[in-house]
Amino acid sequence: MWNQIYNPLGSAALSTLAAAIPVVTLLVLIASGKVKAHLAAIIALILANLVAIFVFTMPANMSIRASLLGVVTGVFPIGWIVLNVIFLYRITVETGRFELLQRAIGGVTTDRRLQLLLIAFAFGAFFEGASGFGTPVAITAAILIGLGFSPLAASGLSLIANTAPVAYGALGTPIQGLASVTGLDPYTLGAMVGRQLPFFSLLVPFWLIWAFAGFRGMMQIWPAILVTGVAFAIPQFVISNYINPWIVDIGASLISMGCLILFLKVWQPKELWLSPKLRGNDESAATMKPPKPMDTTKLTQPQLWGALLPWIIVCIVMLIWGTGMFKSWANAIFVWNYPVPELDKMIMKVPPVAARPTPEAAVFSFTYLSFTGTGMLLAALVSGVLMGISPAKMIVEYGRTIRLCAISLITISAMLAIGTLTRLSGVDATLGLAFAATGVLYPFFGTLLGWLGVALTGSDTASNVLFGNLQKITSEQLGLSPILMSAANSSGGVMGKMIDAQSIVVASTATNWYGHEGTILRYVFLHSIALACLVGVLVMLQAYVYPFTAMVLK
């Protein structure tokens, strides 16, 4: 048995600096653009092992086993999702159905800004709600690149858009995780998050279009942006506060998409924005072929249904795969839980990170049938059959997809290994305790702790499990609402999603722009920090300033 140590150097400052070495190295190497993402991840993983073993005194066999657990987790379920999303996209291109989808979207609007609202924000939120875990970025980035957007625009804007829905992703999994470690009521936590994120559900669509087209380009379509944001934010609040936190994203996204499409039947911008490039310096534009003019010829009914068929199948399958009933049924048929020897329940999380000494689980759960990626593969295979692709051709295309994604899968696995190792070694808890020592400013920095957690782990759920109890304990010691600060961990965390290395690799893979992760990170980094700080300001107001304090649930 090994107890985690959070101040191994006897100095909080020095221990925090040591704990930051792996993640800072990873971000700096990727942002430099001079080191490929998979090499940066491997270097950072080696450093994480050295820090865990020689600074935090984690036994070497535990450190290596934790890394291997992370590697496998990177393939299943995360890499498995990416692989099958790309496979689906490739067979729709191969059969010409994606070109029909382009025409269908062009029939709604040829304006690139409005396409972003429809695809990146509203459609992406649906997939976040149904499955989460990288699915929305993979799908929306692939669709945007297919529509002719530049690689940087498709990847970067998909990441920015996938923020406001994240706290309720995968049918409320982050809220469930937060409730499990804090002991607080999940409905109350979900409702409190629903009193924070709607402000940003209204803001993010404006932010998204400003990032793409500049202030003037944004103001030209402000009515459509307002409709999209309001139609998402109000249902997000109502569903989370008066129904449940499990269906928030699905309900809000469908209402937002429907309202935008209906609004565009009676309103269109006076000046169309047809450029697929980011306004200003878009270095990815040089790699693009000149975009073909979008064919806006009205589709026949059979063509329209043919274009939408694969995506309708995906929506249905993802909804089914996300339900607890299906997961219970599928896992009853097949599940393999592998407790890692000499690691599972052999590490103790201790106060102040946990209320009492708590053994850390280290189990690889191979729930193959209920994996989101398996549902995506089934959707792709069914779509392929209905689109007339032979089994032999699908096998060949799947082999090509594996070759295309191989390096990305290695990268994702190495990054998950870093996240797993830092969690089990207590390295990330040391970083969290540094934020917890900020006193009266804790509502702001506690929110940034959630942001850091997602940036480190790549998951709002993992961040909530990692820091949720720390938020509860610290807030009680400071006389703050534990409901407020636990919810702030999740709300602040959503803004870290766009800079976590795993999501960036998913975006670069989906846009076939692998090797440019540094460019993507540099593009989204300031957006991420700015939005996280705004969430922190809101939480500060809710902690101390009336009437915002009246929003806090007891």
What are these regions (language model features)?
Residues 7-21, 74-78, 131-136, 188-202, ...:
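Structural signature of hydrophobic alpha-helical transmembrane segments
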